[in-house]
Amino acid sequence: MINSPRVCVQVQSMYIETQSQPESDRYVFAYTITLRNLGRHPVQLIGRYWLITNANGQETEVQGEGVVGEKPRILPGGEFQYTSGAVLETPLGTMQGHYDMVDDQGQGFHVAIPVFRLAIPSLIN
C-alpha cells in the first residue's frame, strides 16, 4: 500500500470592492492558498480542479495545469503560496476542489481543497 504524502491546504479569501460592480452583478474575490508539505519526500503540483458555486446554486467547474502559470515542487517541510481570483454574479458563494499532485516516483494523488466561502463583508456577521 502506498501512503499518500501529507499536504496541508490553508485558504484565506477576501472581497475586492474596488474591482466589483454590484449594480452589474459582478463581485470580485481574491483567495490566497498556502500548501505545506508535511511529508518526508518532495511533491509537485501539476493540476487543479475547482467547483465554484454562487448563491443561486449555479456551478462552474474549472480545471487546468498547475496554478498561476506554475507547477511548483514543494520540498519536505516547505510551502508554496499563491493568490488568484474568482468573479461571481452574487455577493456570496463557495469554492472547493482538489489539486493533482505527484511524488518523486511519479505516483499521482489528489489533495482536497476544503470548501471555503466567498462573501462580501456585510454578509459576514
Curated annotation (Swiss-Prot):
Entry coiled-coil feature ranges: none
Gene Ontology process terms (BP): error-free translesion synthesis
Family annotation (Gene3D superfamilies): ApaG domain
Organism per entry: Sodalis glossinidius (strain morsitans)
Domain ApaG: 1-125
Superkingdom of origin: Bacteria
Protein name: Protein ApaG
Record Pfam families: DUF525
